[in-house]
Amino acid sequence: MHSESPIIRRQSTRIYVGDVPIGDGAPIAVQSMTNTLTTDVAATVAQIRALEKVGADIVRVSVPTMDAAEAFKLIKQQVNIPLVADIHFDYRIALKVAEYGVDCLRINPGNIGNEERIRSVVECARDYNIPIRIGINGGSLEKEIQLKYGEPTPDALVESAMRHVDILDRLNFDQFKVSVKASDVFLAVESYRRLAKQIKQPLHLGITEAGGARAGSVKSAVGLGMLLAEGIGDTLRISLAADPVEEIKVGFDILKSLRIRSRGINFIACPTCSRQEFDVIGTVNELEQRLEDITTPMDVSIIGCVVNGPGEAEVSHLGVAGSSRKSAFYEDGIRQKERFDNDNVIDQLETKIRAKAAMLDVNNRINVQEVEK
């Protein structure tokens, strides 16, 4: 029930990764990358399907060898979600996976080779109508740029990006997006800011090698949050040393917190104190697990007492405000006659949330049909 995001997004061109639009006002796409051995087709397919289940729009797959390229062919045949092939060092692998139906090619200018090799990749991408991501990384800049700047700097990352943007421009190829990732938040943010002023192409956001699940999520939220709040970014990946499924969840949580794109339930919950009338922490943790299948955007407030409970509930789709013996229940900001037993809040609220989600889905379908008329 909270208002729309006040963020004005940067204008960019539009490309498509498979059937997923990127840029020009399209929803910010959330993606992850498999961490299985690509040659283990069954494991890689299973992980891709797990990512798709939690809402991934795009999945990137590392293709380090020709054997991996042959495995990629089999993987592509077994999944529906768009796949990006991550190519380093050997440009010929890009040519091979293009034959196998890849939806996007990620190339790293720091190691893909000379302009003639890039030309070969671009011409192949053009023939197969495949977009490219120019993926700059602070840890793998070209040797001459490393020598020039001594260390990764915003100027270094942007210069590397612009070199290859210029190559694609000369080849009259405009179906590409760009990333300038770094593990340092300020370095990445400033690099993206500068690049956003110089090109119109979509930008893929990420803080590379951000760390483990907790620290990496925080670092990514800070860095990407700064950029997204300024309207910069058309697609993103959260890089965690963790289960890739967590990357998708964190990505959507960041977008949800900025009201840019919502998927599933936005739980508003207090940190608890001695005033709580029911187990708020246990309730939230249990409901988050039980309701992972709900994709309907919805605000649900779970507050343990009457200090902030009513106020939060009044701006939520559903809300519970703790009170002695029985807690108050709100729907669409209005307090209901029904009250929840404090020892059974989880089951009662789950039932209400599922019913509300179904109702909102019906209303959304009706609204879409009205617009289409």
Curated annotation (Swiss-Prot):
Pathway: Isoprenoid biosynthesis; isopentenyl diphosphate biosynthesis via DXP pathway; isopentenyl diphosphate from 1-deoxy-D-xylulose 5-phosphate: step 5/6. [4Fe-4S] cluster binds at C270, C273, C305, E312. The keyword Iron-sulfur applies. Keywords: 4Fe-4S, Iron, Iron-sulfur, Isoprene biosynthesis, Metal-binding, Oxidoreductase. One of its GO terms (molecular function) is 4 iron, 4 sulfur cluster binding. Its cofactor is [4Fe-4S] cluster. SUPFAM superfamilies: Dihydropteroate synthetase-like, Nitrite and sulphite reductase 4Fe-4S domain-like. Its EC number is 1.17.7.3. GO terms for biological process: isopentenyl diphosphate biosynthetic process, methylerythritol 4-phosphate pathway; terpenoid biosynthetic process. Belongs to the IspG family. Converts 2C-methyl-D-erythritol 2,4-cyclodiphosphate (ME-2,4cPP) into 1-hydroxy-2-methyl-2-(E)-butenyl 4-diphosphate. This is 4-hydroxy-3-methylbut-2-en-1-yl diphosphate synthase (flavodoxin).
